[in-house]
């Protein structure tokens, strides 16, 4: 009788573990908190008419600088980084409360022109 209880308890525990594992989200958590590069309504400038701007994340990575490349640098840096930014493919200029802003119409990941310091 004791072995039946033990087997039943083991089966119950295994079922619970499988339930927990199955309910765990199976998604890429590397970019958690940063959505894909898309058009979003800018709440600051969207007073009398909607103004859309590109927001979101794209590709970025950092890796050790190859020795051959470090020898060519005027100021050697141990880490090299690459990145693409969420930028507007198409946009047009509009005026909101006397301020000229760009209303984006399409976004994509491309070369970063402006970097945050």
Curated annotation (Swiss-Prot):
Keyword terms: Disulfide bond, Glycoprotein, Hormone, Secreted, Signal
Assembly with partners or alone: Heterodimer. Glycoprotein hormones are heterodimers composed of a common alpha chain described here and a unique beta chain which confers their biological specificity to the different hormones.
Gene of this entry: cga
TM regions (residue ranges): none
Name of the protein in its database record: Glycoprotein hormones alpha chain
Cystine pairs: 34-57, 37-86, 54-107, 58-109, 85-112
GO biological processes: G protein-coupled receptor signaling pathway; positive regulation of steroid biosynthetic process; regulation of signaling receptor activity; thyroid hormone generation
GO CC, alphabetical: extracellular space; follicle-stimulating hormone complex
Signal peptide: 1-23
Gene3D superfamilies in the cross-refs: Cystine-knot cytokines
């Amino acid at each position: 009788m004791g072995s039946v209880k033990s087997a039943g308890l083991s089966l119950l525990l295994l079922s619970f573990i499988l339930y927990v594992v199955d309910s765990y989200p199976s998604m890429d958590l590397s970019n958690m908190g940063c959505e894909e590069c898309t058009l979003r309504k800018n709440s600051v400038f969207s007073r009398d008419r909607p103004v859309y701007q590109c927001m979101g994340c794209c590709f970025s990575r950092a890796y050790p600088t190859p020795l051959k490349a470090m020898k060519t640098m005027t100021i050697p840096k141990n880490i090299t980084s690459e990145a693409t930014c969420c930028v507007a493919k198409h946009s047009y200029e509009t005026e909101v409360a006397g301020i000229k802003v760009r209303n984006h119409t399409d976004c994509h990941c491309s070369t970063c022109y402006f970097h945050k310091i």
